[in-house]
Amino acid sequence: MRRTESVHVPVSLLVSTEGSGIDRYSQELAKRLPVSTISTGRYQSIRQTISLARQFALLKQPVHLPNQHFGRWVPWLNHPSIVTVHDLVRLAFPFAKEGWISAMGLARDRTGIRKAAHVICVSEATKRDLMCYLDVPEEKITVIHNGVDHHVFNPRQKQDSSGSRSPYLLYVGSERPRKNLGMLLRAFALIKQQGHPFDSLALLKVGPAGRSDAFRKGTLDEAHRLGIKSDIQFVEQVSDQELAVIYSNAVALVFPSLYEGFGLPVVEAMACGCPVITSNVSSLPEIAGSAALLVDPHNSTALVEAIRCVVLDPTCRARLRVQGLLRARDFTWDRTAEATFALYQRVFAHLETEAAPSNG
């Protein structure tokens, strides 16, 4: 996509330099939109915070803050802002609350989101959460889905990038409680007990555990208790190119999360032709559509049956592959950028008009 033509009102975009899916959002927009950028990490030292505050104080144009954690900066700004909200996990999912520091940050985020001129939500589910938990009026919210880089995430030749020579189920994400990895481990243990052809099946887990070492310890302890520790492989960091190969080689992505603002691995897997099994809650039915097997994330029997379908039924696998590839076409960063650009024009140009002095 060519870079979008200049917007009527110059806009500054805060770009997070880290590597999560949320951080990628701002990086992909920066490639495609005619914005000036301010680079920062999601978590700042005191020195970085002071430097960022000074930059904001000098800004003479509207600002797009690309995730809800940056909403705390809205009161520092002298110009209108748009805040993107990716999820409200700390409000919607109680296990995500992490003490007084988190509570203080959440309070500041809430203040900023409410004071923003407009809010982007990455799914209708997140929009509903925003209206429910923060009482933000619907007319102040626009839903713009995330995208996927189809130049990277596309079907690849079968090869051994994962290091696993056995057929494998794939999970991509952290080991935080809301990700529901424990349920996947229990379902995997049950299906391994069914013998051939499941006895050769492995589980590949890609991504760091999360901010707490306790998450990985809990995963390993549960795997040991279930007797499947030797059947699980952990891969901490991979490049996007390597991840695309891993998706393409997997029997299926199994993503039984209890709460997602969007669920980027679902679309990445579909774009690579990987069958997807995911939850029927939160944003996941919205994002997956009819192109995945949707299961109750609290029901290990339902998860086992979905895995059996994908492993044993070639027709099921082929259908999920074809429908997933078609569904993934609906999510591109070009489309995300174009919708964001249109919102800049509507919100910021409208505000500029309101602020302009009348003649006479």
Question: Which residues are covered by each model-predicted region?
Answer:
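Carbohydrate transferase catalytic cores enriched for Leloir-type hexosyltransferases
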Residues: M1-G360
